[in-house]
Design a protein with these regions (language model features):
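N-terminal Rossmann-like NAD(P)+-binding domain of SDR-like oxidoreductases, especially those catalyzing
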Residues: 1-131
Length: 131
């Protein structure tokens, strides 16, 4: 059984990833500060003994013994970027630094998520997403 940390785990993608990894028999730690995520998204998971929900801001270092890290923490809309641009930058930059540091310390695999917002708005191409 793997110990897995998911930052931004109470967001849309994060909550679905938490559910999937629990279904596969893993121990899941979900971190979220609820800036854009919601505890409502993970309420069904709270009864699973292999699920732990922690309110935490990834711009502050976090310690855990884990095998894998999925760093999904970041406000997911330009609307939120404008509401609190400093928090957005802190979450993206310090969050990545903190999770990479944790991964190095505990020798964990890490997936660093990004956003379609890094692409050009002028692109005429359609985004194709495959699972």
């Amino acid at each position: 059984m793997k110990q897995i940390l998911i930052t931004g785990g109470a967001g849309f993608i994060g909550s679905h990833l938490c559910a999937r990894l629990l279904e596969e028999g893993n121990e899941v730690i979900c971190l979220d500060n609820y800036f854009t995520g919601s505890k409502e998204n993970v309420i069904p998971l709270l009864k699973n003994p292999h699920f732990e929900l922690i309110r935490h801001d990834v711009s502050i270092p976090f310690q855990a013994e884990v095998d894998e890290i999925y760093n999904l923490a970041c406000p997911a809309s330009p609307v939120y970027y404008q509401i609190d641009p400093i928090q957005t930058i802190k979450t993206s930059v310090l969050g990545a630094v903190n999770m990479l540091g944790l991964a190095k310390r505990v020798n964990a695999k890490i997936l660093q998520a990004s956003t379609s917002e890094v692409g050009s708005k002028k692109s005429l191409c359609r985004w194709l997403e495959r699972c």
